């Protein structure tokens, strides 16, 4: 049981813990739901081009797919459900109308229903995290799975922010997840710079998935046909009462400078001179 | 229960050279979201599990020994696309079957031809004409991929003139005795279940044909040597030999003397589904040519910058897209119950002839390299040519269409 009442803590902290306790009991007594956030991104195999006006990357007439790390997140959620630890896997995607395609892929993989928060704005991780928090308040999942990062912005922030906003424990860069149903704990191996770290996190928790966690299944043909009848609920940011004002403004997007070919140096002195005065690394 | 096919490492994807080109973006007017998902899924499956074997299948003239492609396709629910769900099928229509056929053909022409013979010529004929008992007996194993199916109508002396077949079925107590030969039977060497047409009444012309279900191992039924073909190598084809082969009464498909209706109506749908084969080959040609012309340089520039090459590629693309539109529109009509023999013949007539030309141009775009067997283009041409011949030659298809147009008011 988590430490619930600390006399020195602020009222807001205490009430958050009370919510945690309620959720904790809630999750112990009922089979849980898993919420999986899936992002629609430019397909990993596409050659990226920057728009001429430098406001972003070209996405018109470009192949889009589910973020590969989100696929891994969804796969893990499906496996947990198939092992009997969860009763429902809900896929959620935030973005334009075409996100429905991404959700349909998720449904075809085996998710039970989808939620589409429709918007044409580009939202940065904090806004996404706020939206996911609102959804978690409504759906009360026992686990929230996200990919560790999206391959278009490589932010690696959303999962961590969702956990902080909810006051839930987080285990990021998961390469192995084992659930203990009785203790309501997830044991997660994390891939960190120093190697592998193993954490026990009390549920409900946020887990972000790394490459080696699993290999996502193909959407089987029968499941693709069945997915047609699975529901996708449409919502707006207004429905969820989320403040979408962002403190970050994207000024410009440019391609990295073209890689120059290597230069043969004639002596160590010349090498040091170049490292110091051209590359500015020493 | 998890179902995993070959390993899909994302790292592997990033490192491996691109095999798939994105010129496969067919018009979204052709397909709705579910059909696009279906196509994407079969495409992934075929590229991961079939395409890696394509070259070796062609070189060795046989399916791979280390992996059972029939079972793999069966596990992916590919065989029974048009079969009822109670037998393990998907209960879908010809549109979906064509989508699957195109994507498998894109990975390997030989595998697609064998797949088409198994899933359409055999399985679909049983679905359309079989009794409940026959479907119960034969469909489950065919749909799972445990058994391979085939169909035999042509004979050494009866190709285009298929109604002139000489294979005889003499009525005896409890069944029939079959005597004769069948030629160019796809999957013949490995099939456990075969639909075979024979003459129960040699004097009644077309009305004397009856369709039978033959099982491998029936006494008097044997297969002769595997044929050594120009293309579609690996899609085993052979001659069937019937020497006093007893076939029980219950193995008649539909009714005695009604075989020609089974045959002709089956041919319409066979032509439609097989028409997706050349579509896949044309797509494979583009998959091979586009990366090549982007990277091959002559006169200091990629050859894809030159007008002649761009012209060829444009012609290849439009040939593919227009054939695709025809095939899938007709598939939609057939799913809605409007089967027009003219259009069914038209789709394969059109797609097959274009595919041969596209494959020739693909070789030309690769220049000297196109003539080297290390590149796929030679195989694509040899595979494409079959579609102008099998399922009724182009000449027969023209007669079917022209004759009908002449007769119509």
Curated annotation (Swiss-Prot), chain B:
Q: Which SUPFAM superfamilies match?
A: Acyl-CoA dehydrogenase C-terminal domain-like (SSF47203), Acyl-CoA dehydrogenase NM domain-like (SSF56645)
Q: In which tissues is it expressed?
A: Expressed in leaves, stems and flowers. Not detected in roots.
Supply the PROSITE patterns for this chain: ACYL_COA_DH_1, ACYL_COA_DH_2
Which controlled-vocabulary keywords does the entry list?
FAD, Flavoprotein, Mitochondrion, Oxidoreductase, Transit peptide
Tell me the function of this protein: Involved in degradation of the branched-chain amino acids, phytol and lysine for the supply of carbon and electrons to the ETF/ETFQO complex during dark-induced sugar starvation.
Q: Which organism is it from?
A: Arabidopsis thaliana
* Involved pathway(s): Amino-acid degradation; L-leucine degradation; (S)-3-hydroxy-3-methylglutaryl-CoA from 3-isovaleryl-CoA: step 1/3
Describe the family membership recorded for this protein in Swiss-Prot or TrEMBL: Belongs to the acyl-CoA dehydrogenase family.
Residues that coordinate or bind substrate: 160, 206-207, 261, 268-271, 391-392
Report any one BP term from Gene Ontology. Answer: branched-chain amino acid catabolic process
Catalyzed chemical reaction(s): 3-methylbutanoyl-CoA + oxidized [electron-transfer flavoprotein] + H(+) = 3-methylbut-2-enoyl-CoA + reduced [electron-transfer flavoprotein]
The enzyme's main class, written as a single word, is oxidoreductase
Enzyme Commission numbers on file: 1.3.8.4
Q: Does the keyword Oxidoreductase feature in the UniProt annotation?
A: yes
Q: Which cofactor is recorded for it? A: FAD
Q: What is this protein called?
A: Isovaleryl-CoA dehydrogenase, mitochondrial
Tell me yes or no: is Transit peptide among this UniProt entry's keywords: yes
Phenotype on disruption: No visible phenotype under normal growth conditions.
The entry describes its oligomerization and partners as:
Homodimer.
